[in-house]
Curated annotation (Swiss-Prot):
<feature type="binding site">
    <location>
        <position position="25"/>
    </location>
    <ligand>
        <name>GTP</name>
    </ligand>
</feature>
<dbReference type="GO" id="GO:1902758">
    <property type="term" value="P:bis(molybdopterin guanine dinucleotide)molybdenum biosynthetic process"/>
</dbReference>
<feature type="binding site">
    <location>
        <begin position="12"/>
        <end position="14"/>
    </location>
    <ligand>
        <name>GTP</name>
    </ligand>
</feature>
<feature type="binding site">
    <location>
        <position position="100"/>
    </location>
    <ligand>
        <name>GTP</name>
    </ligand>
</feature>
<keyword id="KW-0501">Molybdenum cofactor biosynthesis</keyword>
<protein>
    <recommendedName>
        <fullName>Molybdenum cofactor guanylyltransferase</fullName>
        <ecNumber>2.7.7.77</ecNumber>
    </recommendedName>
</protein>
<dbReference type="GO" id="GO:0046872">
    <property type="term" value="F:metal ion binding"/>
</dbReference>
<dbReference type="GO" id="GO:0005737">
    <property type="term" value="C:cytoplasm"/>
</dbReference>
<keyword id="KW-0963">Cytoplasm</keyword>
<dbReference type="Pfam" id="PF12804">
    <property type="entry name" value="NTP_transf_3"/>
</dbReference>
<comment type="function">
    <text>Transfers a GMP moiety from GTP to Mo-molybdopterin (Mo-MPT) cofactor (Moco or molybdenum cofactor) to form Mo-molybdopterin guanine dinucleotide (Mo-MGD) cofactor.</text>
</comment>
<dbReference type="InterPro" id="IPR029044">
    <property type="entry name" value="Nucleotide-diphossugar_trans"/>
</dbReference>
<dbReference type="InterPro" id="IPR025877">
    <property type="entry name" value="MobA-like_NTP_Trfase"/>
</dbReference>
<keyword id="KW-0342">GTP-binding</keyword>
<comment type="subunit">
    <text>Monomer.</text>
</comment>
<comment type="similarity">
    <text>Belongs to the MobA family.</text>
</comment>
<keyword id="KW-0547">Nucleotide-binding</keyword>
């Protein structure tokens, strides 16, 4: 079985946050802490290697760990961060989570590791109803396919999944793990629930 110590995990904070009024979501505060800090608190007991993908405010993010930007400058969404993460991580297996999901499961990394098979390329979380494509674990061997995919201008992740050996990790017992805060209203509502 793949061990959590054999993985690296990247927090994806490279988006444009258009629904958050352009404010950098990872740095927006929830209960007096930046969202990214909530994610790190959940993730750091699970893995020794956490990296951050951010395309702006890199100095602010560097307080939390090693920061790198996308290689593709046209903001291809989370796929750009996944691509850059595969390039920067030192392990063969690289996991990804978004910066705006403060309730990540405390066993997320372990569940992904347990689901890895010898021929796995990509593992994607599934909440019982939907796949959660930014909660994922990639093997570095996917990098050439992902590079070609992005160079072609493709952005639909489902097409990449069809090119690779993709499987799904069951999180149907904990759908709240995937709550992400995309708007000021969602942030305010979630903050009231947490208080």
């Amino acid at each position: 079985m793949l061990q959590p110590t054999q993985t690296s995990w990247v927090i994806l904070a490279g988006g444009q946050a258009s629904r958050m009024g352009g404010k950098d979501k990872g740095l927006i505060e929830l209960n007096q802490k930046p969202l990214i800090e909530h994610v790190i608190e959940r993730l750091s007991p699970q893995t020794p290697r956490i990296l951050i993908n951010a395309n702006r405010n890199q100095d602010a993010y560097s307080k939390f760990g090693f920061v790198f930007s996308d290689q593709f400058k046209d903001f291809p969404g989370p796929m750009g961060g996944i691509h850059a993460g595969l390039m920067h991580a030192e392990t063969d297996w690289v996991g990804f989570v978004p910066c705006d999901s403060p309730q990540i499961n405390t066993d997320l990394v372990e569940r992904f590791c347990q689901a890895v098979k010898e021929d796995s390329d990509i593992l994607v979380a599934h909440d019982g109803d939907h796949q959660q494509p930014v909660f994922t674990l990639y093997h570095k061997r996917v990098l050439p396919k992902l590079t070609a995919f992005l160079e072609r201008g493709d952005r639909k992740i489902i097409l990449l999944y069809k090119e690779c050996n993709t499987s799904y990790v069951d999180f149907s017992d904990s759908p709240n793990c995937f709550v992400n805060l995309n708007t000021p209203e969602e942030l305010a509502q979630f903050g009231q629930l947490e208080s």
